[in-house]
UniProtKB/Swiss-Prot annotation:
One of its GO terms (biological process) is detection of chemical stimulus involved in sensory perception. It comes from Caenorhabditis briggsae. Residues 1-22, 83-107, 171-192, 256-278 are extracellular. This is Serpentine receptor class alpha-13. GO terms for cellular component: membrane. The chain crosses the membrane at residues 23-43, 62-82, 108-128, 150-170, 193-213, 236-255, 279-299.
Length: 335
C-alpha cells in the first residue's frame, strides 16, 4: 500500500530512501524542474505575441492570455515543489522520520497548483462561451464591448482561486505528505471529486466546441453579404472560432488525460508501493507538459490566422458574388 500522506508523521521505509538515492530518479526530478523553466520562455513569448496580434478579437485574446497566466501559476508551483523535493533528497535523508511535510507547510504550493489546473479548465469553457455569444448575438456582443470578457475573466479567477479553500474547508491541515505534490491528507476525496468534474467538463467542452465550429462555418453562408466589411467580419469571426476550437480541443484532451490518469493513480494507490506510486506520479501527471505545449500551439495558431487573414482579404476583394450565387449559397447552408 502506498503511503503518500498520513494523519501523523511516519518514517520513510528503506525502499523510499533507496528511491530518493537513485540517480535515475534524481535525474527525472531534475528533468521535471527543466520543464517549467523552459515553458516560462514560451509562455512569455505567447503573451507578447497575443498582445500584438490584432487579427484575433480582443475578447478572445484576453481569455487566451488568462489561460497562459493560469498555466504560469501552475508551472511556478510545480517547479517549487520539485525543488523542495530535491532539497529533501540531497540534504535530509539522514533524518528518515522527518522527510514528510505538513499539509499546512505545503498550502501555498497546493493553492497555486489547484488554481492553475482549475483555471486552465475553466478558461477553455469561458472561451467557448465567449465564442457562442459572439456568434449568436453579434450585434449585441459588439455593443457590450468589454463586458462579456470582464465578467467571464472575473468569474474564472474567483472560482479557480476559491476552489482549494472550498475543498479544504473542513481540513485542519495537520496531516503529513511525502512531498508537496500530494493533496492534503483529510481532503483527498474532495480533490478526487475535483478531478472527476474537470474530466466531465473537458468532455462537455469538447462536444460544445465541435458544435460551435460547425455553426461558425455555416454562418459564413447564412450571413453572406455584398458589403466587403460584413464579409470581412464574418471571416475574422470564423478565424477566432477556429483558434478557440483548436486550442480548446487540445486543452480538453490534456485536461481529460491528466484528470483521468491522476484519478486512476489515486484509485490504484491502495494496492501499490510508495516507490511505484512516486514513479507513476511523474508519468501520469501530464499538466506540466501541457503547459509547455499550450503557448507553442497558441503562437502557431496566431501565425496561421495572420496568414489566413491576408489570404481572406485578397479573396474577398476579388470576389464578385451575383444574386443567383448568393441564393445558391443560402440554399446550400439550409440543406
Amino acid at each position: 500500500m502506498a503511503i503518500v500522506s498520513s494523519e501523523n508523521r511516519t518514517c520513510a521505509d528503506e525502499k523510499l530512501l533507496a528511491l530518493y538515492q537513485s540517480w535515475s530518479y534524481i535525474a527525472s526530478i531534475v528533468f521535471n524542474c527543466l520543464v517549467p523553466t523552459i515553458s516560462t520562455y514560451f509562455l512569455g513569448r505567447a503573451i507578447f505575441q497575443l498582445c500584438n496580434q490584432a487579427t484575433i478579437q480582443y475578447s478572445t485574446r484576453i481569455l487566451l492570455i488568462a489561460t497562459i497566466l493560469f498555466a504560469a501559476c501552475h508551472q511556478v508551483s510545480y517547479f517549487a515543489f520539485k525543488i523542495d523535493l530535491l532539497h529533501t533528497m540531497f540534504f535530509k535523508l539522514d533524518q528518515p522520520c522527518f522527510l514528510q511535510r505538513s499539509s499546512y507547510d505545503c498550502r501555498f504550493i497546493s493553492i497555486a497548483q489547484t488554481t492553475g489546473v482549475v483555471g486552465m479548465a475553466l478558461t477553455g469553457l469561458a472561451m467557448s462561451t465567449d465564442r457562442a455569444l459572439a456568434l449568436t448575438f453579434p450585434a449585441d456582443y459588439h455593443k457590450l464591448k468589454s463586458v462579456p470578457r470582464v465578467v467571464l475573466s472575473v468569474f474564472v479567477f474567483i472560482v479557480s482561486f476559491s476552489t482549494w479553500f472550498l475543498l479544504t474547508m473542513n481540513d485542519p491541515l495537520t496531516g503529513y505528505l511525502n512531498h508537496c505534490g500530494f493533496y492534503p491528507s483529510y481532503s483527498v476525496a474532495n480533490f478526487q471529486l475535483m478531478l472527476d468534474v474537470i474530466l466531465y467538463l473537458a468532455i462537455f467542452n469538447l462536444i460544445w466546441d465541435v458544435i460551435l465550429f460547425y455553426y461558425a462555418r455555416q454562418q459564413i453562408l447564412w450571413r453572406r453579404s455584398y458589403q466587403f466589411q460584413k464579409r470581412y467580419e464574418a471571416r475574422i469571426s470564423l478565424n477566432c472560432t477556429q483558434a478557440v476550437f483548436v486550442i480548446s480541443i487540445c486543452q480538453c484532451i490534456s485536461n481529460g488525460a491528466n484528470s483521468g490518469l491522476m484519478r486512476l493513480l489515486m484509485m490504484i494507490g491502495t494496492s501499490i508501493t510508495s516507490v511505484t506510486y512516486s514513479s507513476l506520479l511523474s508519468l501520469f501527471y501530464t499538466a506540466p507538459y501541457s503547459c509547455i505545449l499550450l503557448p507553442i500551439l497558441m503562437m502557431r495558431i496566431s501565425e496561421y490566422i495572420r496568414e489566413q487573414r491576408t489570404i481572406g482579404i485578397l479573396s474577398l476583394r476579388s470576389e464578385k458574388p451575383g444574386l443567383e450565387e448568393h441564393h445558391q449559397r443560402m440554399r446550400a447552408a439550409w440543406s
